[in-house]
Amino acid sequence: MASPSFCLFAALLALVSWQAIASDPSPLQDFCVADKHSPVLVNGFACLDPKYVTADHFFKAAMLDTPRKTNKVGSNVTLINVMQIPGLNTLGISIARIDYAPLGQNPPHTHPRATEILTVLEGTLHVGFVTSNPNNTLFSKVLNKGDVFVFPVGLIHFQFNPNPHQPAVAIAALSSQNPGVITIANAVFGSKPPISDEVLAKAFQVGKGTIDWLQAQFWENNHY
C-alpha cells in the first residue's frame, strides 16, 4: 500500500500538472509567429520560418475612427488576437477595445479560454460576473474612468453603460492568444440548427411560444 506521504506527493504533482496545462502553453523560443498557410494542424498555429519574420508580424495599425455602435446591444468589441497579429502565437495574450453607446451593453458572455482584466478609459460601466453552480453568486461593481475589474476564466460576465447621454470606452486584456467568446443569448436562442423548443421551454420554465419567439429574433453579434 502506498504511504500517505507518497499519496500526498502524487496529488500535489497532479495539481501542478493540471495548472501547467490550464492555460496557453509557454513558448520554447523567442517567438513563434503564426504561419496561417501551413498545412500542419496543431493546437494554435505552426511557426513561420524565422528568416521570413518582420516587425509587421508584431504590429497592428491604430484604428483612429471610433468603431460603430449601431447594433441592437449598443456596443462594439474590436478584438486584436493572433488572427490580427501573428506574432501573438504562443504568447498567451490578446487585447480588445470595447465601445459602448449610451445605455449600451456587452451582453452576458463567457471566454472559454481566458481570464479578462478590463480598464475603463472613458465614461462609467456597471460590470459583473456570476459564479458557477450551485451558488450562482453575482459579483458586480460600478466602474469609472481608470477603474479596473477582473473576470475569471470561463465565468459569465457583462458590462453595461448606465449613462443615457454619454458613451463609454474600455480596454480589455485577455490571457490567451485566442480567448474565444460565447454570447449566452446568441448561443441558446440563435444556434444553428436551433435547440429544440421543448428543451428550452423546460429549461427556462416558459411556454414553447415564448421560446419560438425568442428563436425567431436576430441575435446581434457585437464582436468585429
From Swiss-Prot:
Keywords: Apoplast, Disulfide bond, Glycoprotein, Manganese, Metal-binding, Secreted, Signal
Principal localisation: secreted
Glycosylation sites: 76, 135
Extent of the signal sequence: 1-22
Domain Cupin type-1: residue ranges: 62-212
Keyword Metal-binding: yes
Disulfide bonds: 32-47
PROSITE patterns xrefs: GERMIN (PS00725)
Pfam families: Cupin_1
Family matches, as InterPro entries: Cupin_1, Germin, Germin_Mn-BS, RmlC-like_jellyroll, RmlC_Cupin_sf
Sequence positions that bind Mn(2+): 109, 111, 116, 157
Superkingdom assignment: Eukaryota
Gene Ontology MF terms: manganese ion binding
Location(s), subcellular: Secreted, Extracellular space, Apoplast
Its biological purpose: Plays a role in broad-spectrum disease resistance. Probably has no oxalate oxidase activity even if the active site is conserved.
Subunit details: Oligomer (believed to be a pentamer but probably hexamer).
Family the UniProt entry places it in: Belongs to the germin family.
More details: Member of the 12 germin-like protein gene cluster located on chromosome 8 in the major-effect quantitative trait loci (QTL) for fungal blast resistance. Partial suppression of the 12 germin-like protein genes increases susceptibility to the fungal pathogens causing rice blast and sheath blight diseases.
Name of the protein this chain belongs to: Germin-like protein 8-9
